Amino acid sequence: MIGLVVSSADTASVTISDQLHELVEWESHRDAAGDEYEQYDDFEMRTIDEWHLEAENASELFSTTPQIIAFLSRHSGDTGPLLTTHFTGNFGPAEYGGEPGSFAQACPMIQQTLLEAFDRYAPSKYDVGIECTHHGPTTVGAPSLFVELGSSKAEWNDPDGAHAVAQAILELSGEDAPANVETDRTVVGFGGGHYAPRFERIIRETDWVVGHIGADWALDSMGAPAANRDIINHAVTASDADVALVADDRPELTKVISQADIRVVQERWLRETTGVSRPMVSALENALVPIASGLRLGTPATEYDPATSDEFVITDRHTDNDAVGTVHTKDSTDIDTGTNHNVDAERTESEDSHNIRDAIDRADADAVVLAFPTSLMETISGIDIETTNQVFSEHTLAFETTEGGTRPTGRMIVSDYLSVESITHALIDILKLKYDRVERTDETLRVRRQVFDPAKAATLDVPEGPAFGRLAAGESVTVAGRTIDPEAVHTTETVTFPVFSTSSSSSSSSSSSSSSSSSSS
């Protein structure tokens, strides 16, 4: 049951109630104490005389304890027409109801649903948003939030604005309603302004929901984090969160939160993990590096459903971790990942067998950690960094990056050899943009191109300067009455990169090649 609390002292609350009665038919009842209340579907509406922020133990008003309680309220401020919602509590003193340093239980999924519904129903002159945690009540007896119409007398009496709020409230009911949905994707927020734009952005643009938010002014009223650990912990538990986002540079607060075994993340972490199960995120971060250190998650990672598998095992012979599970990697000496971050670009054949098809087939794991050589990645990224990122995002579970997440290092996690093949073919296409000829053997990519050779030009008495530039650009020049063609001063540059074999044997026989015509001298 969803409990609705109307305050007869609050004009906006009464206006919203009127619109709820316009939208649906409510049945009137009286409880054992003789108090009147109304019911519709999963809703029960109670009217009180006092202001909402004084309505402690509101769950006791209802015939049964509600799953959630929504306080239908006005919003006051200089914000213009606004539909908003927020949770209640006090990080500092209790100046407007409730107890100091105390919080009502939040219902983040409900807030997300209301925000989305506000977007659909709000009249054009109204803005839509959320607020930080503030005022009472702090002892409600059920998860709760304020649903507000504002921000002046004109809006409090506006049937159109109230109608939008009423429509949004009615969307909280039903079998698939948020009150019936559990989530492990709740973040508690610290820092920022009263209207919490960063946290609203997280709700709108990721699959994470947000619990209590301690705005800058609220944290300042709380005092030193180290002296108020209980308050911080209460905000976390009242949000049912195990992840926190600190919006500003607050090292002491971050330290206190971390010491309570609450993971402090960046907005990038919330965006990167959107659509990826928490067990999968943990497994990928444990196998490579944390997202904060440059890990990026690929589209295939969103396809893993922890409900259909007890564990997801990642194998990497280069790790010392021998644990197996959804949040661990598995060490296996049977796998040769070919990981080498210092491969010489000029070597002509790989030193080890990189037979990935056999390796993955032999692995007692769901995925393996592999790496393309650094030299190849530097070359590829230098040609087309945007396509390189797209390729790794489309075909890996996760991949490491540098330079603020913009350049893949080549170290990655894949679940099948076809993914490696797809990446390799895509990298060949990128190499073709720079090189005249690209040949693939079973374990190498050999690229060739014609490049200007200053030493050859010097032997033909070509002076440095514009003539060098014209020859390098493929134009002929005349020196001392003699025509020198560009072919005479170009040489064939050959670079060989080791790659992974996907054949059934480890031989180095030619498996495929891709080339265009080239000249050499």
UniProtKB/Swiss-Prot annotation:
<keyword id="KW-0378">Hydrolase</keyword>
<dbReference type="InterPro" id="IPR018033">
    <property type="entry name" value="Deacylase_DtdA_archaea"/>
</dbReference>
<dbReference type="GO" id="GO:0051499">
    <property type="term" value="F:D-aminoacyl-tRNA deacylase activity"/>
</dbReference>
<feature type="region of interest" description="Disordered">
    <location>
        <begin position="323"/>
        <end position="353"/>
    </location>
</feature>
<protein>
    <recommendedName>
        <fullName>D-aminoacyl-tRNA deacylase</fullName>
        <ecNumber>3.1.1.96</ecNumber>
    </recommendedName>
</protein>
<feature type="compositionally biased region" description="Basic and acidic residues">
    <location>
        <begin position="343"/>
        <end position="353"/>
    </location>
</feature>
<keyword id="KW-0862">Zinc</keyword>
<feature type="compositionally biased region" description="Low complexity">
    <location>
        <begin position="501"/>
        <end position="521"/>
    </location>
</feature>
<dbReference type="InterPro" id="IPR007508">
    <property type="entry name" value="DtdA"/>
</dbReference>
<feature type="region of interest" description="Disordered">
    <location>
        <begin position="499"/>
        <end position="521"/>
    </location>
</feature>
<dbReference type="GO" id="GO:0019478">
    <property type="term" value="P:D-amino acid catabolic process"/>
</dbReference>
<dbReference type="Pfam" id="PF04414">
    <property type="entry name" value="tRNA_deacylase"/>
</dbReference>
<comment type="similarity">
    <text>Belongs to the DtdA deacylase family.</text>
</comment>
<comment type="function">
    <text>D-aminoacyl-tRNA deacylase with broad substrate specificity. By recycling D-aminoacyl-tRNA to D-amino acids and free tRNA molecules, this enzyme counteracts the toxicity associated with the formation of D-aminoacyl-tRNA entities in vivo.</text>
</comment>
<dbReference type="GO" id="GO:0008270">
    <property type="term" value="F:zinc ion binding"/>
</dbReference>
<keyword id="KW-0479">Metal-binding</keyword>
<comment type="subunit">
    <text>Monomer.</text>
</comment>
